[in-house]
Design a protein with these regions (language model features):
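A short, charge-rich alpha-helical start-of-domain segment used by transcription regulators
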Residues: 1-22, 35
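Arg/Lys-rich amphipathic alpha helix in sigma70-family domain 2
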Residues: 51, 64-84, 102, 153
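DNA-recognition helix of helix-turn-helix
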Residues: 140-164
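Amphipathic, Lys/Arg- and hydrophobic-enriched alpha-helical face
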Residues: 13-31, 48, 113
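Internal acidic/polar
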Residues: 80-106, 132-133
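Short amphipathic alpha helix immediately N-terminal
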Residues: 115-135, 139
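Structural recognition of an alpha-helix C-terminal capping motif at a helix-to-coil junction
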Residues: 36-43, 47, 56-68
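Hydrophobic positions on the alpha-helical face of helix-turn-helix-like DNA-binding modules
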Residues: 41, 65, 123-124, 136-137, ...
Length: 164
């Protein structure tokens, strides 16, 4: 590809790499897995970049590619490894002044989110990213109404998981 296309891709990836890192955190349990998934998502983004038409925001398109790649790899790894060690999950919280109680609650919440199915995880992830239902539906390729219904069900499911 041309240097300008390559530079455009690298610039956009650098600008929005936090999206990929957040998806990686949600679907991996170790730094090595995180790095592998980040690399695989980057490869898939590069392969798909010529097809990006700009009809949606780049970040929306990036979410879609990243989530689809993560879900595909997660399903493959789930088939080969049935057990996962949730105690080894480390969450980096990007805010200051969290007391231990808040940190423990966040850790519990993310552990429970990891128990959701792939689509539910993606819904929660996008919801926590403050995406509106239109953006969620565009990213996941579902209708806006379906995104709302699924999100309400997932909220109820998470409530039950967090408060048995």
């Amino acid at each position: 590809m041309e240097k300008t296309v390559q530079k455009q891709f690298v610039d956009l990836l650098e600008e929005h790499q936090n999206i990929v890192h957040k998806v990686c955190r949600l679907y991996t349990n170790s730094q090595d897995q995180h790095n592998d998934l980040f690399q695989e998502i980057t490869i898939q983004l590069w392969k798909a970049f010529p097809k990006f038409r700009g009809e949606a925001k780049f970040s929306t398109w990036m979410y879609r590619v990243a989530l689809n790649t993560a879900i595909t790899l997660y399903r493959k790894s789930k088939r080969s490894i049935q057990t996962q060690d949730y105690d080894s999950v480390m969450f980096k919280i990007s805010s200051e002044d969290y007391d231990d109680t808040v940190e423990q609650q966040l850790k519990l919440m993310y552990t429970k989110i990891k128990e959701l199915n792939d689509i539910e995880k993606a819904l929660v992830f996008l919801y926590l990213e403050d995406k509106n239902y239109r953006e969620i539906s565009d990213t996941l390729g579902i209708t806006e109404v379906n995104a709302r219904v699924k999100m309400n069900r997932v909220k109820g499911k998470l409530r039950k998981l967090l408060n048995p």
